[in-house]
């Protein structure tokens, strides 16, 4: 179990440093996060973008960046393409999106000729440190699939389970969230949640326990589940919340950050490597946390949770 991002940092710090390819690295928060992780011995980096700006921002942050670690790219498209090439060439282990549109880097990732897609849907996982909750909490998918059907939700679950296995969890606990716990043909997400549970029981997602349909309060609070007579191994212990739509996930994550003071990491999974993907306006801390997650997923020491 990972209780918080400090726990995660400890695991990353005990592993061999990985290399991140940063597309459009000429951004203060992005570069600050990368440089801090590098100074701590957590990772190495290759910075792609406007070379002069990257070196200048580095100096502003008090760091003289070695020009040998910088690759100039005149456009966002060039930066994304070069970053993906570094993954294919084995020179980098994972990607980070810098000061560019999300669509630009994803277009390079899924390019059928030159990309790093693996022929299955990609999805986003927000990993949150929420005050009052005993461990890190995943929320998926609040960033990639707007209204997934059952097959889309299966891909989302599969990606999330693989991510948590890579983070060291032997048997992650998932809750397929709905407004209520009963299956109703009129509420399609309850039907899908029940189908996901059956798929998990059949071993479709690998080793995990998935409950659904289940409401948010029961997923996160064992006492609420006890009062309502809802018995499941996940109540009060959920590792991953599977939301019914991108909007639901996006709103939930932002509410936890704004009102509960949650800390976040954002990762896209389902390609040949994880992608640290945050809003361009995301804080230094969020981008740093995302690097930690990707570094551990990229081959750090694994431990049972």
Language-model regions: role of each:
Residues 1-47, 51-234, 239-305:
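Anion-binding alpha/beta catalytic cores of soluble intermediary-metabolism enzymes, centered on
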């Amino acid at each position: 179990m990972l209780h918080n991002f400090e726990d995660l940092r400890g695991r990353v710090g005990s592993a061999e440093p990985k290399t991140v390819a940063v597309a459009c690295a000429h951004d203060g928060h992005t570069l600050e996060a990368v440089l801090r992780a590098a100074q701590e011995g957590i990772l190495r980096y290759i910075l792609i973008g406007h070379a002069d700006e990257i070196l200048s921002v580095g100096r502003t942050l008090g760091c003289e960046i070695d020009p040998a670690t910088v690759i100039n790219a005149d456009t966002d498209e060039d930066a994304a393409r070069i970053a993906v090439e570094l993954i294919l060439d084995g020179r980098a282990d994972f990607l980070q999106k810098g000061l560019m549109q999300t669509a630009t880097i994803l277009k390079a990732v899924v390019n059928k000729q030159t990309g790093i897609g693996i022929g299955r849907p990609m999805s986003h996982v927000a990993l949150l440190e929420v005050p009052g909750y005993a461990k890190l909490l995943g929320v998926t998918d609040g960033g990639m699939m707007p209204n997934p059907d059952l097959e889309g939700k299966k891909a989302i679950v599969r990606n999330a389970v693989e991510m948590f296995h890579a983070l060291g969890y032997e048997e992650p606990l998932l809750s397929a969230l709905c407004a209520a716990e009963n299956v109703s043909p009129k509420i399609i997400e309850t039907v899908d949640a029940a189908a996901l549970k059956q798929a998990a029981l059949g071993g479709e997602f690998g080793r995990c326990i998935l409950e659904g349909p289940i409401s948010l309060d029961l997923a996160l609070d064992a006492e609420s589940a006890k009062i309502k007579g809802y018995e499941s191994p996940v109540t009060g212990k959920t590792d991953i919340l599977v939301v019914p739509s991108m909007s639901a996930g996006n709103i939930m994550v932002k509410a936890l950050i704004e009102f509960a003071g949650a800390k976040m990491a954002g990762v896209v999974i389902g390609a040949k490597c994880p992608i640290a993907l945050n809003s361009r306006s995301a804080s230094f801390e969020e981008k740093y946390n995302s690097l930690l997650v990707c570094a551990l997923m990229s081959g750090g020491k694994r431990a049972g949770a």
